[in-house]
Structures are given as C-alpha cells and as structure tokens.
C-alpha cells in the first residue's frame, strides 16, 4: 500500500495538474451511487436520443469547483438549480471566467445558460419568440456566436414512433438575436465542439437506408453550417457510436472520444485516441485504447458493444496529447469519479465522493481561441446555388 501511495503521489505531481482547479457536474445520488448509469448524472436516456428525452427533474445537482487536487479535495459550489434540474453540457469559455450549461427553465423546457465562475451573472444565452423550441448541448464560437442543438425540426426517431425528439444544430447570434438552422438531418446531432482550426466537429446519427445500429459518425463543418463532411467512421460497422469527441491541443487531426453501442449501456464506453489522417474507417484510424496501449483493437460488430466492459468512461477532456481528465467507473461496484488518464496506461483517481457521482471535468485555465472562419453564405440572398453530385 505504501508503494501504491507513492505511485499516486508521483502521478499527481504531473505539471498538467498545476491548474489545481477543475469544474465538474456534481450529483448527490445516495445509496445507489455505485449502481447507477450516466442517466443519473444528467445524460441522455439512451444512445439514440438527446436531452429532450432526459429527465427534467428529481436531481440534486450542482456545478462545482474542485481544488487542492493533490491533497484533500476542496469543493466550492458555483451554481445549483433550485428546480431539481440536472446541469449537463458544461463548456468553459476560453477566458476561463464563465461557462455555459443546459438546464430546465421555469417552463420545464431545456435552455442554454451561462454563469460566471464566481457564481454570479446567471443568464439565458438564447432568446427566441418560438416558445416550443428547446436548446441544449451548446458551444461557444470564436466569433461570439453560439451553436446549440435544438428540437427545431419537430421530428422524432422512427423506430420509437417519434417518441424521442430529434435534435439538429442551430446558429445563434447574441448581438441581434438571429437564429438559423444548420443541419437538416433525419436523426440526431450531438456534441458540437470547436476544432483547433476553427471548424466544428460533432456526432451525427445517419439512419436512412443503412444499418442504423452502427452509424453514429464524427462529422465536421464550418461554423456557418457549410462544408459538412465525414471526419471519422462513415462506411464502417465499428464502432457503433463515437461520443464526446474532443480535439487534442495543438494537433491538426487527432482527437479523443468514447465508443459505445446502440442498445445497452448508455452514453459511456471505451476510451479511444483517433487520427483521421491515418485512416477514417473502423479501427484503422484508432491510435490506441486507453488504458490498454498494447491491446489490439478488434473491429467488433455488435449491437451492445460495451455491455459488460470495464472500465466505463464518459466525458474526456484532453490536457495535452498524452494526458486527459475523464469521468470513469472502474467496475460494476465503483463510483463515477474523476480520473487522470494517460497514454502510458496510468489511471489515477483525483476525486470521488461516497453517495455521489461526478461528471464532465474541465480544468480552470485560459486556452487559445481558435481562428474565426468567415461566413460563406449570405442569409436572404436570392442568388442561385449549384450543387455537383
């Protein structure tokens, strides 16, 4: 045990933790905290739905700051809903002074909010006269605009008779309140994230005329919605789903993501490093699985891809190209805690609390703002467009 303590001290001495502050979603669950899946931490109900299908109440949740990461963890509440809402979709602004998140509003509809890290300045970020619209899963843009997922299409997932609403992406400009739909997909978009080059990566579920158990691909596009292209997974049966994709700092192509199934385990799964410049299909562009660098990645074609697989990971955050924060549950009797994981197979606990679950770790530090990609469209223009097939 002395050797293990020493190992832990050495791993936590890593300079990547000099930030000494992490933002998390904190969920007080109670005696079932070791048995719950990510639904209890505010995520979607399954791998084909978005936030409109998630629970809208009954949570004891807050956005918290963890500090003193190498010792006895200190906690500070940044924001706590007073209506029992969860607080998913945490995104820290590049200035590290404010963050956005999703929360159920007074009318029980999902909306995107912002709060300063000192707990002040709570405000709704997207205002629209369309009272039926809900917004969630949003991200800041370098231009000052916002991309959010919304129920704007008023359509549902076919195989559940439309009972789970589909979320497509919208572009919102806080300066003039303009809202424009970016994607017109039959099924869901998830997790828009700004890449290092200013483009947007996201997961798209393709459904029509294919085996939709295996078709949640990583896409990328310009912030104005133009040039939507596959980034990883198109034309492959493995993996079924890639969630929570985030670019590695300073790298032009590599990203980290969680692969999961269709039915079965919800939202969490195996942690993978990808490089589309190596390949864009199946396991061929996967650099390694964390924390199993020497284990061959087999392209398993299976509906419930990660059922019975441990550890389970969700919501990774790259600190460098080798070190990452991640939410993990190590086995079926473990808590959902925050870990430091690296490409050398080390998995080090930073924080967990009995009776609770922690999710979505984000380091409190300023980060470079990606370049602004100018709009390539003129809304309202009547010029004829041409498409080549």
What residue spans do the PLM features occupy?
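Conserved small/polar residues in nucleotide/adenosyl-binding loops
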Residues: 387-389
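Multi-bladed beta-propeller domains
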Residues: 71-85, 116-134, 172-187, 222-241, ...
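Residue-level detector of Asp-centered blade-edge/turn motifs that repeat once per structural unit
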Residues: 17-18, 94-95, 141-143, 195-197, ...
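Beta-propeller blade signature
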Residues: 61-67, 113-119, 163-176, 215-226, ...
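Long amphipathic alpha-helical scaffold segments
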Residues: 1-77
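Hydrophobic beta-strand positions that form the internal "hydrophobic ladder"
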Residues: 22, 99, 146-147, 200, ...
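Loop/turn-rich, solvent-exposed surfaces of beta-rich toroidal or solenoidal domains
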Residues: 203, 247-339
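Short, conserved, GDST-rich strand-edge loop motifs in beta-rich repeat architectures
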Residues: 27-58, 104, 109, 148-165, ...
């Amino acid at each position: 045990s002395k050797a293990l303590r020493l190992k832990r001290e050495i791993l936590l001495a890593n300079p990547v933790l000099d930030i000494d502050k992490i933002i998390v979603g904190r969920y007080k669950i109670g005696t079932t905290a070791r048995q719950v899946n990510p639904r209890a931490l505010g995520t979607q109900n399954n791998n084909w739905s978005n936030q409109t299908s998630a629970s809208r109440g009954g949570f004891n949740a807050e956005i918290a700051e963890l500090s003193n990461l190498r010792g006895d963890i200190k906690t500070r509440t940044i924001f706590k809903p007073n209506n029992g809402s969860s607080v998913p979709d945490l995104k820290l602004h590049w200035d590290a002074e404010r963050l956005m998140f999703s929360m159920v509003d007074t009318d029980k509809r999902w909306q995107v909010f912002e709060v300063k890290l000192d707990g002040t300045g709570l405000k709704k970020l997207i205002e629209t006269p369309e009272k039926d619209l809900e917004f969630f899963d949003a991200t800041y843009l370098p231009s000052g605009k916002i991309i959010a997922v919304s129920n704007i299409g008023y359509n549902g997932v076919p195989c559940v008779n439309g009972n789970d609403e589909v979320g497509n992406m919208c572009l919102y400009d806080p300066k003039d309140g303009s809202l424009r739909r970016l994607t017109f997909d039959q099924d869901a978009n998830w997790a828009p994230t700004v890449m290092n080059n200013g483009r947007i990566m996201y997961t798209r579920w393709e459904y029509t005329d294919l085996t939709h158990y295996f078709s949640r691909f990583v896409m990328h596009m310009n912030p104005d919605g133009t040039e939507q292209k596959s980034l990883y997974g198109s034309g492959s049966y493995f993996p079924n789903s890639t969630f929570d994709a985030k670019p590695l700092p300073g790298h032009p192509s590599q990203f980290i993501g969680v692969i999961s199934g269709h039915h079965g385990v919800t939202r969490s799964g195996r942690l993978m490093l990808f490089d589309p410049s190596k390949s864009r299909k199946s396991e061929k562009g996967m650099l390694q699985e964390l924390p199993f660098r020497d284990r061959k990645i087999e392209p398993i074609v299976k509906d419930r891809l990660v059922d019975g697989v441990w550890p389970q990971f969700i919501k990774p955050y790259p600190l460098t190209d080798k070190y990452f924060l991640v939410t993990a549950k190590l086995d079926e009797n473990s808590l959902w805690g925050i870990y430091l994981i690296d490409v050398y197979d080390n998995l080090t606990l930073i924080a967990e609390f009995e009776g609770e679950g922690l999710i979505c770790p984000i380091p409190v530090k300023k980060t470079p703002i990606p370049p602004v990609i100018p709009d390539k469209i003129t809304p309202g223009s009547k010029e004829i467009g041409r498409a080549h097939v």
